[in-house]
Amino acid sequence: TINILSRKSDSDNIPLNFVDDLDIASDGQIYFSDASSKYGYGSDRLELFEHTPNGRLLVYDPITQKTTTLLSGLYFANGVALSSDESFVLVNETLMYRIQKYWLKGDKAGTSEIFIENLPGFPDNVSSNEEGIFWVALFNPRNNFVEISSNKPFLRKIVLRLPELLQPQPVKHSFVLGLNENGKVVHN
């Protein structure tokens, strides 16, 4: 095992609590997600019910050994994938049913935009291939409770205090989408 990051290695002095996915650029830069700066691995249910933007997209430079936050305020930052030409990187926002695009090169470098939104389920991991297709795993269909309670923190707190057996349960169904580099579904 090689340890290249400590929990306190972020440039913003925010601990890395839930490092989730990564992709490595040809120059060695490591792009990765921290799903939640508040909760650690195994606490995704808390993150789901709290529904707050605690996630981040970061990059680690192995030469300078510095970690930089590229995007913060993400709702459970999850899968990460570079485009085939490495001009942008994608990061899933699981709790918002969408994927963000962060530009690395060109006129838009350093900015972000929505790559695709209103996905039919929670996007989990994402990977890309040489043909420019992004394969996105969706681990459950959209959840009515998440949608209804997204702007009702009091309701979410009440539900969190219920025994887990009485809390809303996910539908266990997963599927995969293939997206082109413009965010259009080309395989489902």
Regions found by a protein language model. Name each.
Residues 1-188:
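Sequence-structural signature of mature extracellular/luminal beta-sheet repeat domains
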